[in-house]
């Protein structure tokens, strides 16, 4: 059995998230239908993570299996013909048979976009905030995330996860180049909990508005209680932008780094 990674992007506006839902469309379902149509059999697709409803991805990774060796360029081309306009496949890449899109991922990176400007053409991809925010104070609070590994306070309640332990390696607010009214929160970790990034952003916004001190943000983490954290920021401004893997999971002929050939310069949307 051969295993393949699919590198794709999607606009999550019209989807109830990545994962198949009983009463709503999902990115996973669309991808499975396209693959099943092309390969003429039922195909299961496993993603690197589960983005929530309305959340986007400029780079998601998923895997599927097939008995025969496939021409990966042809697979990518056929999928792009079958998929709706808001889902695009960058590349299909053969990996080792035991490689896993979710469990072998070593890091994931998300970006969240906040703007003070009213602009109709990016309203689906920015969270508009009112009034000024203290981004220096927000970054000071964000740096405290590196001191902790239990993020129960930022996890969705009543989920089936076995642990709320995550290792955050980057968390920073920066002004978006070319857009003086837009700031971007970039966060990288080995794994993320359900709703975690949006909960962190929502709580950091309270710091930026002066409603919560940096020490108060620290206490929110330490209390390990979701009710103590801020309201989750809307999903429409959140993007999954990268998923990282060890090189040894790739077959010998595909060991070149994929990102340099997939993403636009800067790797942002």
From Swiss-Prot:
UniProt: substrate binding residues: 110
A biological process term (GO) from this entry: tRNA pseudouridine synthesis
GO molecular function: pseudouridine synthase activity; RNA binding; tRNA pseudouridine(38-40) synthase activity
Keywords per UniProt: Isomerase, tRNA processing
tRNA processing recorded as keyword: yes
InterPro entries, A to Z: PsdUridine_synth_cat_dom_sf (IPR020103), PsdUridine_synth_TruA (IPR001406), PsdUridine_synth_TruA_a/b_dom (IPR020097), PsdUridine_synth_TruA_C (IPR020095), TruA/RsuA/RluB/E/F_N (IPR020094)
Catalytic activity entry: uridine(38/39/40) in tRNA = pseudouridine(38/39/40) in tRNA
E.C. number: 5.4.99.12
Residues the record marks as active site: 52
SUPFAM superfamilies: Pseudouridine synthase
Segments passing through the bilayer: none
DNA damage recorded as keyword: no
Any one Pfam family match given in the protein's UniProt record, by short name: PseudoU_synth_1
Family recorded in the similarity comment: Belongs to the tRNA pseudouridine synthase TruA family.
Function: Formation of pseudouridine at positions 38, 39 and 40 in the anticodon stem and loop of transfer RNAs.
Subunit: Homodimer.
The protein's name: tRNA pseudouridine synthase A
Organism of provenance: Bacteroides thetaiotaomicron (strain ATCC 29148 / DSM 2079 / JCM 5827 / CCUG 10774 / NCTC 10582 / VPI-5482 / E50)
